[in-house]
Amino acid sequence: MVHATSQSASTEKNVKPCIETDTEEVNHKNQTKQYLSESESGDEYDEDLENAVSECSYQTATTSSVADTDISNICDQLLVLSTTNHKSMGSTRGKKKRGKTAKKAKKANRAQKITEEEIEAIKKKKKLDADKAYELRQEQMKIRQEKIDASDRNKIYRRLAQTAVDMLRKEERKLPPEIKQLDEDLEYYVENSKFYLRINLRDRYLETRVDEISEKYIGPALEHKTELLKIYEDLIKRSLQAFRLFMFLKTLNEKSVDYTKFEVLTLSFVMKGFEDDWLEVNGTYEENESYLSFEKNILHDIPETDQHVNAAEFVMNKLIYYAKKDDDGTLNLKECHMKEAYTGAGQLIAEYKQCTNAIAFLQDNRENLAYNLMEEWFLVSRKPSPIVL
């Protein structure tokens, strides 16, 4: 009985290590499979792992009394192989696998084919554009040639007009028949038209003619025409300002100091033709404010025809007054200068009316066949002359 008990105890002692060995074997196999599944290295590492597993299985199957040291050795071998495998994986990880590069497929030509109708349409459009460009060049050349021709003709008209003006200055009354007829037509026109209508025609001419001659003439002819029109514009502007000043002067007391001072300023403007701000620069603040108030509250309701009549009457009365004193021999030096200044003012008013009549006649005869000669003659012969005292 004692022998049996000792034998069973010995058997139990031998079986227990074997069970533990089997459990450890299963755990190691599972670890090995996990390493194999994570690995993406070459076949040589897989073979080493398989050999190690086979060897471990063989040793476990043949003997059930393998010591713990043998199992430890096997685990050490597996650990070494696993470490080597991971290092190899780290060195190859992140690198692209080399392989045969596939040839890129050629892109299909997706351009739409142009039909014959579209080609013909493109050709027609190009031809049409070329024809338009050619016509534009021809039109520009035609316009330029017309400007040259008009400028050349203007030279002839200008020479004829200047010759006639020189004849008038020399008091030779035998003018060319064409020029004489133009003067007669102007006289007839003035006698049979209203002055306010002539003012409207004059303004329309000055507003439009500057742009028209820029399109019609070129070179010296253009400069000549532009200069003449500017002289007429300045004369009209200066005359209208003088009319307003004379009307304001008429409202003041002739025996006051303000009247005397403003009269000198007005005549200075007539003689020298100051700019628009002449009164602000040369007059006092009170004079400037008084005139501006008069211009704003009274003058804006008075038409140009009435302003012209009032200014003309005022200047005429002054000339009659100084002429009478001159005849009596009581005209002093200061009054003599005032008489000369009012004589210049009378000249300005006369030229204003003369220029208005001539320009209105030109505007009313724009369709006349002899218009170019007519315009050159009247602009030259009626050109304002400087006021000489």
Swiss-Prot record:
Q: Where is the composition biased (Basic residues)?
A: 93-110
Listed Polar residues bias regions: 1-12
For region Disordered, the annotated ranges are: 1-49, 86-111
Give the source's domain of life in one word. Eukaryota
Cite the record's Acidic residues compositional bias ranges: 40-49
Record protein name field:
Uncharacterized protein C03F11.4
